[in-house]
Amino acid sequence: MKKTALYPCHEQSGAKIIDFGGYLMPVQYAGIIAEHKAVRSAAGLFDVSHMGNFFVKGSRALEFLQFVTTNDLAKVVDGQAQYNLMLYPSGGIVDDLIIYRMSADTFFLIVNASNADKDFAWLQQHIDQFEGVTLEDHTERLSLIALQGPLALSILNRLFPSIDGEALGSFHFCSASFNGFDVIIARTGYTGEKGVEMCVPNEAAIALWEALMAAGAADGIQPIGLGARDTLRLEMGYSLYGHEINQDTNPLEARLKWVVKMDKGHFIGKEACEQAMQHPQRTVIGFSLEGRALPRQGFTLYNSDRQAIGVVCSGTLSPTLQEPVGTCSVLREYGKPGTPILVEVRGAFHAGIIRSLPFVTNTSLA
């Protein structure tokens, strides 16, 4: 089992450790609800170093990435990042990822931990068509730290006085120096709150983590585990691979049509997307339940006649709303907000309604 460079920090903080994506990762520290509320009200620090990260380099790097992804990277400038998708020819999703343009011939990719090996192999499979383009896996060399919450940018400024996080702008990044090491600081996140995600060499990771915790101590910063990371992203309706998106889900079903630019050149899966637009079958949408029954992935959704209409993708008790919420994949005719549904939980039917996403709208990013 792998450990991130920050594993000693998690042990010292008394975190509960689990296996996630082949890494020993903290699922919680003080508790999922307390950590969730800390991020919504103040700030939290996340170790996301298990995420895969690759460099794509070469004079045809942009051309290569345009071919294997759906969004239009030609519109991205140096210092800017873009949310993107890789598709199979069938239109199913290989993975979702963020691509950072370092320069005209250098791009930095962050992919899901559970998909890192698969993604690297997928990219390697297609790279030979683009002479001179190289693919480098830096996952074992770099640590990724996310600082998120309404107070995150002011905490960042205490440690890096020359960086104005507000001025940097969403999905933009810059470079800074910490203890003689280069740090990439990006205005990205997975919580719905203001914040940054930082990439630093493993050698400097513990010192940076401790410095950020010290800088935010007066504001109540807390270390945050994967449990609260999941409840935070679910309240926002953000997709998680293996739940809302997978190899059998196309971007249109997953509410990710905005990431697919049909007016750019050819890309893998383009024809399948064109067909899916003509004959949409399902949609991923939110829902909530009455009572306290918790919906879990794989549970069946029914209409009022108890006919199966879909399946739960993700579910939890929302710490902010204090009610059971989730995402589901349903037949499109049942995907309108306000539609009554039933969810079978442990053999009993529980009433609910289809809800629009996000569930929580009054965040610091809103």
Curated annotation (Swiss-Prot):
SUPFAM superfamilies: Aminomethyltransferase beta-barrel domain, Folate-binding domain. Signal peptide: none annotated. Keywords: Aminotransferase, Transferase. Pfam families: GCV_T (PF01571), GCV_T_C (PF08669). Coiled coil: none annotated. The keyword Transferase applies. It comes from the Bacteria. GO terms for biological process: glycine decarboxylation via glycine cleavage system. InterPro entries: GCS_T, GCS_T_bac, GCST_C, GCV_T_N, GcvT/YgfZ/DmdA, GcvT/YgfZ_C, TrmE/GcvT_dom1. GO terms for molecular function: aminomethyltransferase activity; transaminase activity. NCBIfam families: gcvT (TIGR00528), PRK00389.1 (NF001567). The glycine cleavage system catalyzes the degradation of glycine. The glycine cleavage system is composed of four proteins: P, T, L and H. This is Aminomethyltransferase. The lineage of its organism: Bacteria, Pseudomonadati, Chlorobiota, Chlorobiia, Chlorobiales.
